[in-house]
Amino acid sequence: MAKRRFGIFNFKIDKYGPVYNLIRGVWEQRVARLGIYILIGIIIFSIIGIFYTPYNPNYTGFPRDLPPSPQHLLGTDDYGHDVFSQLLVGGFPVIGVGFAVGLIGTLISILVGITAGLYAETILDRVLSAITQIFLIIPGILIIELIGAYLGAIQFKLGYTVVLFALASTGWAWGSRVMRSLVLSLRRREYILSSELIGESKIGTIFRQIIPNNLPFIASNFFFTAIYGITGFTFIYYFGLGSLTQVNWGTMLYWSLGGEAYLRGLWWWYIPPGFMIGLVAFSFALINIGIDRVANPRLRVWDIKKYKKQLQKAKEKKEVVTNG
């Protein structure tokens, strides 16, 4: 089967297409596989919490501040909740919002970045670039915290849907900025100019040329934005800006802070949710490293050394067989 190089990232195109090649390239990275395994384990853990928990996570009738035991694997908190049950239930909102923020934020960054790049040096580009610059200068989480503090003053707490769209609407600026730069670079390439000369529309150029050539960046931007969504979600509930009646890892940290768990030595109350949040972000970061290695050949030094060692072993094995 004939194969050709694919765009600026030198992917080989076969019958499976660029998406398959990206997935295959990422899967071949050991660090990315580790991140995928960790993420799958956390997702399974969170899905189990939807259908099963040892106890009702909202039940407060247990003895308070019990250390971990066979009856309560992670003990109980200062309010009589079973910590392990809350940990099970609290994972799905965090991961779900993180993925949703990553998806929506990436779509916004693609739309704004490609539009600004295709219409560079126009009024539309200047307006979009100015808006992007504002969101780059002012941290999105700070904006959400200010809005949440104002709404809290009027007794309104942020729900999951509001938090999701608030994070997505403030987490797209970095990706948009980079996407615009990539589009400007691609516009000067010969195959893009050739497609324009033969009459291909801008929509066709976007879906047939620009997006396929930027798949690694789009995937990387998704995980980067998802990390922002998870950390932003946690901060919002940790500072009490969200609805505190909802059980998630952020509210667990909020109540542990209010109960002075650290000062009282109740480590089982705050370490498990903090560890799980860090583990999710760590898995996303590992996958992102794998994507970067696929997209940037300069980061494949470790792989080159590995393949050289394998080649040397194969040569030595061949010499042994020949001499034998």
Question: What residue ranges belong to the model's regions?
Answer:
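N-terminal signal-anchor/first transmembrane alpha helix
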Residues: 2-58, 128-131, 135, 204, ...
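C-terminal transmembrane helix and the adjacent membrane-cytosol boundary/short C-terminal tail
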Residues: 155, 170, 223, 266-324
